[in-house]
């Protein structure tokens, strides 16, 4: 793999390495390892099913805190008649807004562990009365995952993300306004999910592609494809103006860089260690940049060799950052970052790439803590609905608390929805979060 080769550094960079060693290497995991824990390419998602467990009996005592769903219902009510064109007889029992509320309940109530739990909970009078959910059989839940269009949920994500306020302010946040970390992450899929091709005919996985607003601490947009879906193409499809996209070297495509610029945005992206470039101007390294690990800052005449078509229409800058990881000779490994932002201080370019790790932490939250990797549907549309509702659940927590979602906050919400915590205790937890700076 190209990412495992030693970088071929030119004489200028080697000279800079020998002259300057970072006094305080960044502590972010991105600067100490090149392995993405959410996407280890050599490890296939396990296709085997866990041994069956006896179903958990759910009763009304297990369904507390449903008043929160009275706050959610207005968000979902416009979905009620969505995707009902086939229902000419007008006898549909389970509507889209009700299905969405049931999936959200799956995320917030730990008693409900899967489709059978959702089915059993939907039979309870209290759930039918307060959130207004209808009784749902396994068949109706399976049908809902096929017939309800997932796209309206992306619109809700956009509305909630727009309401989220920045959790980080200051000069750095102002200079890096619109900083958006972009990456993809795999969700294990079952062998019968033929649409979810990944690597070869034997493996199955879905992939979610997330745009994460770093300073809001919130996802802005998401799409779902099969495991082999092109991350670069999904980024092209989701581009917005006035964003500063920070991307890893999997997105290192010069035409994509130009597409980002053409969309009215900017980029900071890691390029491959053996990338060729022609220097136009060397920039001095300030003490602040040196402290951030920057060993070289230069404006390029072109990226790539003379044999490649120069697709970038404007000057591009290269910032080389030494990491805390060293090779066998004791020399620091380096990150070669490309950006069209000639105005940013070099230390801010390094910091922006360091912030890319925030999207990886969000993947861990979504899959391992919230439980999004436990798929409720086997078709692509159903997986999209579940992922989008997981994003909505995350955004709701952020809006309720004013902070990015954490395991402790989710636990407190689950205590409340399980009847172990009172409304007052939940409110006290939220107020404590708001008071914590």
Question: What residue spans do the PLM features occupy?
Answer:
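A short, well-structured juxtamembrane/interface segment
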Residues: 162-169, 231-232
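Catalytic micro-motifs at enzyme active sites that drive phosphoryl/nucleotidyl and oxygen chemistry
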Residues: 129, 168-170, 197-199, 256
């Amino acid at each position: 793999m190209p990412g495992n080769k030693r970088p071929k550094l030119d004489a200028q960079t080697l000279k800079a390495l020998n002259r300057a060693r970072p006094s305080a290497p960044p502590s972010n995991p991105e600067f100490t390892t090149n392995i993405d824990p959410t996407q280890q390419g050599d490890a296939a998602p396990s296709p085997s099913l866990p041994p069956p467990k006896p179903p958990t009996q759910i009763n009304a005592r297990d369904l507390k805190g449903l008043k929160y769903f009275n706050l959610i219902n207005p968000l979902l009510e416009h979905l009620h008649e969505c995707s009902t064109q086939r229902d000419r007889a007008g006898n549909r029992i389970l509507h889209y807004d009700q299905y969405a509320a049931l999936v959200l309940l799956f995320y917030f109530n730990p008693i409900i562990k899967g489709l059978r739990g959702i089915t059993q909970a939907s039979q309870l009078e209290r759930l039918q009365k307060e959130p207004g959910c209808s009784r749902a059989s396994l068949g109706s839940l399976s049908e809902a995952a096929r017939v309800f269009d997932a796209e309206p949920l992306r619109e809700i994500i956009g509305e909630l993300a727009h309401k989220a306020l920045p959790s980080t302010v200051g000069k750095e946040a102002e200079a890096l306004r619109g900083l958006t970390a972009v990456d993809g992450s795999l969700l294990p899929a079952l062998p019968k999910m033929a649409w979810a091709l990944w690597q070869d005919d034997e493996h199955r996985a879905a992939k979610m592609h997330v745009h994460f607003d770093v300073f809001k601490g919130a996802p802005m947009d998401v799409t779902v494809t099969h495991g082999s879906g092109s991350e670069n193409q999904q980024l092209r499809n989701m581009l917005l103006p006035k964003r500063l996209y920070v991307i890893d070297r999997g997105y290192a495509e010069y035409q994509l860089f130009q597409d980002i610029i053409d969309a009215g945005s900017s980029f900071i992206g890691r390029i491959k260690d053996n990338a060729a470039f022609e220097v136009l101007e060397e920039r001095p390294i300030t003490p602040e940049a040196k402290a951030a690990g920057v060993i070289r800052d230069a404006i390029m005449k072109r990226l790539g060799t003379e044999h490649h078509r120069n697709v970038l229409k404007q000057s591009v800058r290269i910032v080389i950052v030494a990491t805390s990881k060293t090779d066998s000779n004791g020399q620091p490994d380096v990150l070669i970052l490309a950006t069209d932002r000639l105005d940013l201080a070099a230390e801010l370019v390094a910091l922006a790439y360091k912030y890319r790790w925030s999207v990886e932490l969000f993947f861990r939250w979504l899959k391992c803590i919230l439980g999004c990797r436990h798929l409720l549907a086997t078709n692509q549309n159903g997986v999209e609905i579940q992922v989008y509702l997981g994003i909505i659940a995350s955004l709701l927590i952020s809006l309720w608390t004013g902070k990015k979602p954490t395991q402790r906050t989710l636990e407190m919400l689950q205590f409340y929805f399980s009847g172990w915590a009172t409304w007052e205790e939940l409110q006290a937890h939220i107020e404590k979060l708001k008071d914590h700076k």
